[in-house]
From Swiss-Prot:
Basic residues bias locations: 1-11
Record-level GO cellular component terms: axon cytoplasm; BLOC-1 complex; cytosol; transport vesicle
Record field: compositional bias (Low complexity): 41-55
GO-annotated biological processes: anterograde axonal transport; anterograde synaptic vesicle transport; endosome to melanosome transport; eye development; melanosome organization; melanosome transport; neuron projection development; pigmentation
Protein name in the entry: Biogenesis of lysosome-related organelles complex 1 subunit 3
PANTHER family: BIOGENESIS OF LYSOSOME-RELATED ORGANELLES COMPLEX 1 SUBUNIT 3
One GO MF term: protein transmembrane transporter activity
Modification sites for Phosphothreonine: T63
Biased composition annotated in UniProt, kind: Acidic residues: 61-71
Function, in words: Component of the BLOC-1 complex, a complex that is required for normal biogenesis of lysosome-related organelles (LRO), such as platelet dense granules and melanosomes. In concert with the AP-3 complex, the BLOC-1 complex is required to target membrane protein cargos into vesicles assembled at cell bodies for delivery into neurites and nerve terminals. The BLOC-1 complex, in association with SNARE proteins, is also proposed to be involved in neurite extension. Plays a role in intracellular vesicle trafficking.
Localization (cell): Cytoplasm
A Pfam cross-reference name: BLOC1S3
Keyword Transmembrane: no
Lineage, top ranks: Eukaryota, Metazoa, Chordata, Craniata, Vertebrata
Length: 202
């Protein structure tokens, strides 16, 4: 009876060692599961005040109390020249801004060159404008001559048209006169006409 009341122990599987990452055993799994149950399945009674934090396996996050690591100061390279700071007062800066820049002094040769350049520009502009004016006058005269010739041609065409109308009217009148039977024959000379035979006397 005692032997039957006892539970049979489960047979342990033979453990094999494999090179690489180690796996958890049954005892480790049971221990971790009991710890998680203690963590997450703790007393569920109502708690007041500040809530308790939960512990989670993993890397802990940084808090505000932990000081941030300050970057280490890097030494400046020795090849750079030393920095020189020049400070100017407000009065000096204002005075330099208000002072006008001195005009460069012009020599006599530069003045002569400027005068000759101005005269040359004036002469070139006058010559070009004179050429354009003469060409404009010539074109205007030619246009007026062409207009006069066109007017003369139109007048001659009108005169020819009137003469043609007069000739047509005269030809129509001559046709009327030639075709009329009521007028005497003007072609014969009087006295030379043949005598008409009188009819038989009764």
């Amino acid at each position: 009876m005692a032997s039957q009341g006892r539970r049979r122990r489960p047979l342990r599987r033979p453990e094999t060692v494999v090179p690489g990452e180690a796996t958890e055993t049954d005892s480790e799994r049971s221990a971790s599961s009991s710890e998680e149950e203690e963590l997450y399945l703790g007393p569920s009674g109502p708690t007041r005040g500040r809530p308790t934090g939960l512990r989670v396996a993993g890397e802990a996050a940084e808090t505000d109390s932990e000081p941030e690591p300050e970057p280490e100061p890097t030494a400046a390279p020795r090849d750079l020249p030393p920095l020189v700071v020049q400070r100017e007062s407000a009065e000096e800066a204002w005075g330099t801004e208000e002072a006008p820049a001195p005009a460069p002094a012009r020599s006599l040769l530069q003045l002569r060159l400027a005068e000759s350049q101005a005269r040359l520009d004036h002469d070139v502009a006058a010559a070009v404008s004179g050429v354009y004016r003469r060409a404009g006058r010539d074109v205007a005269a030619l246009a007026s001559r062409l207009a006069a010739a066109q007017a003369a041609g139109l007048a001659a065409a009108h005169s020819v048209r009137l003469a043609r109308g007069d000739l047509c009217a005269l030809a129509e009148r001559l046709d009327i006169v030639a075709g009329c039977r009521l007028l005497p024959d003007i072609r014969g000379v009087p006295g030379t006409e043949p005598e008409k035979d009188p009819g038989p006397r009764a």
